[in-house]
């Protein structure tokens, strides 16, 4: 079984096993050896591995094993099990809570050390890494570098997307193809999801860059777009001057247009599995957090598109909030918050119960305001397409078709998509409040 395999890596007996509070399943593990010494590990599991998947725990394990021999700080891989699709990493000292650092100057020093680690990563000799078998062929054109991971996501989720209509995903994917970079400085190993909270720090120094399951060959500018996105979700003092510092350290030219492009690429690529998760009953992971990622993320994508295209976007008026609340759903939410949450001792159980409370609150708002939000969206689509657009599902289908056929100009379409996203973020406010008042940091 899994636990005997984990214990054998000590070797010894498991003296600590605690569920880590995170979106993906992970466990804090201590293995006590016969001589009394303790191996401190971090166990990651992939319970639903997919063949030929471009995002995987196995990929992360291989990258960490390779990078241990470089000057890019990563957790050591202590063991990988093909049988259990499990990886045991060393538990690196440090904190990931960069937003919680209350000294702006220290926050800045940490981010500068981090950007140095990313600069070193992007300058590594690819042949010496011997990762081609795991990561596949390297991109041979700028378009392949920019679109390879997006195309892999579209392929991986083809069955879901065949029956799922979302105008922002459709427009975003098309936009990325239209505006893909025509030249890049080089192909690098990119982390693919890098930035605040995906690295640990001690003092003012990065102790480990973590979460490598998205790692791949690509344009180094992609990671700068990733940093924009992660700083959006995890505000850490802004980005002013950091990308210029990256250029000085790496010798790789930075452009504002590249950062604008790749923050949209990161969002569109990342939103495909998030939309899929939000459509999945009985999701093993936290639906509340996925709803937050979806609706805050969709709004941020629209704002990034507006910025890249010089299109002004703004929130529309929201529905009347005077409609009576659902007595049953309000009572359920209050019971979870008032009576059950205080009685739970496990941090993981408390986290999941709070997630359930958020879902109940979202259901209550959906019941009160969902129809009004969808009606407003139908009116917007009708004005744009100059046609009658009811019911809602039919209106969305007509918009998706118009986008695919390129019958709508960019500016009014981006503005419509933004109004839709603002309304949906408002509708799912209890989930969106998990990441309150998130805004893009200014770019160099």
Feature locations, PLM:
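Juxta-kinase regulatory segment immediately upstream of eukaryotic protein kinase catalytic domains
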Residues: 1-14
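Short, surface-exposed acidic
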Residues: 12-17, 252-260
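Short, solvent-exposed segments of well-ordered alpha helices
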Residues: 51, 195, 233, 258, ...
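Charged, amphipathic alpha-helical linkers/stalks
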Residues: 307-332
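ATP-binding pocket architecture of kinase catalytic cores
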Residues: 16-149, 155-168, 184
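Active-site activation/catalytic loop segments of kinase-like enzymes and analogous catalytic loops
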Residues: 221-254, 265-286, 293-310
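C-terminal amphipathic alpha-helical interaction region
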Residues: 323-358, 363-444
